[in-house]
């Protein structure tokens, strides 16, 4: 009797463990977006949102003497500047890679950005001054990723998130 009870407990425990592992695998496989462009969230940090008060910025995002903030995104070192509107609200965020990135690295960065927002970055045609550039739009906000140099090869990448201008 004791042996049967012990086997049932082990079997129940095994079933529970298998269910838990399945849940972990299933949630790990879903492509959860980390940031919502529709809400103005910034890909660099869950604490940054367009329209938030510049006075309420977390300490790590406060620019000292207007110098860029150094951080990392997708494994690439970036220099970030934040811009406020007249009301003191965060209007735009610009991140520039500190190193020249190869076209493969640029594509890797683009894919990571697309995954973080769960939106495609659409290639922009007819932009001769910036031949490798992509846009993403949602909910009145835009992400613009392009090369700093006007070439198709290696170069510094600029990623800017901002509110789209409204028609007057």
What is each of the regions a protein language model found here?
Residues 154-164:
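Short, hydrophobic/proline-enriched secondary-structure or compact coil segments at domain edges
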Residues 67-73, 128-138:
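Ser/Thr-rich, low-complexity intrinsically disordered terminal regions
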Residues 4-16:
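Bacterial N-terminal signal peptides that target proteins for export
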Residues 133-138, 147-148, 166-168:
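Terminal recognition/anchoring or ligand-binding modules at protein termini
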Residues 144-154:
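Short, exposed beta-strand-loop hairpins at the edges of beta-sheets
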Residues 27-122, 163-168:
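Short helix/turn-capping signatures at newly exposed starts of structured segments
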Residues 115-135:
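Short Gly/Thr-rich strand-loop-strand
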Residues 16-25:
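Bacterial N-terminal signal peptides
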């Amino acid at each position: 009797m004791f042996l049967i009870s012990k086997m049932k407990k082990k079997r129940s425990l095994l079933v529970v463990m298998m269910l838990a592992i399945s849940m972990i695998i299933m949630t790990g496989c879903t492509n959860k977006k980390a940031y919502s462009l529709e809400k103005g969230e910034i890909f660099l940090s869950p604490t940054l949102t367009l329209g938030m008060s510049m006075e309420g910025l977390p300490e790590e995002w406060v620019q000292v003497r207007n110098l860029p903030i150094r951080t990392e995104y997708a494994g690439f070192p970036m220099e970030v500047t934040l811009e406020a509107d007249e009301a003191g609200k965060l209007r735009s965020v610009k991140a520039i890679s500190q190193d020249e990135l190869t076209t493969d690295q640029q594509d890797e960065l683009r894919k990571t950005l697309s995954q973080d927002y769960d939106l495609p970055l659409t290639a922009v045609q007819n932009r001769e001054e910036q031949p490798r550039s992509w846009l993403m739009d949602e909910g009145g906000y835009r992400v613009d990723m392009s090369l700093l140099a006007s070439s198709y090869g290696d170069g510094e990448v600029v990623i800017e998130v901002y509110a789209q201008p409204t028609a007057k």
